[in-house]
Amino acid sequence: MMTLRLAELAQVLDARLIGGDHEITAVSTDTRTLGKGALFVALRGERFDAHDFCDQALQAGASALLVERELPLAIPQLVVADTLKGLGRLGKLVRERINPKVLAITGSCGKTTVKEMATAILRCEGEVLATAGNFNNEVGVPLTLLRLEPQHRFAVMELGANHPGEIAWTTSLARPDAAIINNVAAAHLEGFGSLEGVFHAKSEIFEGLSEGGIAIVNADNEFWPKWRERGIQCAFSLEDQSQPFHARDIALNGQGCAEFVMVTPQGEVNLTLAIPGRHNVANALAAAAGCLALGASLASVKAGLEQMAPVKGRFCVQRWGSLTLVDDTYNASVESVLAGIDALTAMGGYKVLVFGDMKELGEESAAQHARVGHHAREQGLDAVLTVGEQSRHTADAAAGRHFDNKASLFEVLAQMINTHQEISILVKGARGSRMEDIVKMVVDRQESATC
């Protein structure tokens, strides 16, 4: 992070400065990460108030506090009306000072994969700062911007949301030069009320575009006509070869990875992706469109996409002989599960979906879980094993098997691994379902078998 002074921050934040002026070299909302030179931001939530931990921040070595009321502590304090808004303005200040080219990405699914693809492409051009983990909300976005350093030519920002207005705020901080909506699908319906609500929330990302900024959307999405009515022309598509960014001659190789020709306004390039699934062609098109908008070369697009390594929990493939295990456990929206099933069908041997609950689907939950089961059956999967309250609907629709706990499920899965000479397993579920527990069981079994 660039060095800032408290007196300067007081002006930017319209804050009351209590105590002396000091240099600030780090900003944190977590008392466990504090040290000399750090500003501790005391956030408030429905179930917590970090003002209660400011004495711990002082003991941990913090040099100053950002608070909403003066505290009886011997430490400099910046007093503001809203510490969350104050944190955002700090991130915006650093973004303006460093002034990298910024690519912002949102979508109901695939946004992290697009972020990783774009980061790999832009690293071929220069230093890149990218969103780490799930730092994609109204707290994580400013904390990411605060990590910017003078050497960063680019920033790749993932913007998520679980309520209206959140992306409008974070995009106003990031001020992207290009922004991508990867898709709009049934995810976080509880927070937005309907698919139309998700569309409006994701579309907020374009409100913060810098002057001359480029809006990029998925022309295969049902909301494409509405984006087109708004004058958006930069689109990518797997199905419509009239779009500026599209693919042709798509084929999946023996590892399930796509080989295809990417067509862009800057020319064509032959590509072989390093991660499986036809759906990742669309993700690659989105990433390419965003990076080319920031000035990357087509050569960097090819090099970055072909070098990109799988991300843990994001369609990460492990193989032991004829056993293929796909760990896609980080999260699950309906569309990402359907895409995962499609990718599984291209793999070899006995095909098994191990599935946990999806979350935040509201009244649509039962129907959407059943939709997954119907798709698995239509695609001819050999087995569907489910665990969780809602995934029972998936098992019923797929004529699969439902289990009360993961241990019971794994017993049956282990029998399948023993029985079938070649087997491919996709493990999928929402973050709250912790389906990585099943992945660990399989990995531990295989590693112990090879010892």
Language model segments and positions:
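Conserved beta-strand scaffold positions in the cores of enzyme catalytic domains, especially
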Residues: 17, 77-79, 102, 127-130, ...
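Active-site beta-alpha connecting loops in nucleotide-dependent enzymes
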Residues: 47, 311, 329-402, 430, ...
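ATP-dependent carboxylate/acyl-activation modules
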Residues: 105, 312-314, 432, 437-438, ...
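Acidic, Mg2+-coordinating active-site environments of NTP-dependent enzymes
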Residues: 67-74, 178-325, 349, 374-383, ...
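N-terminal leader/targeting and accessory segments in enzymes
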Residues: 1-89, 93, 346-347, 374-389, ...
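Phosphate-binding loop of NTP-binding sites
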Residues: 86-219, 223-232, 415, 419-421, ...
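Residue-level signal for inorganic ion chemistry
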Residues: 9, 38, 57, 90, ...
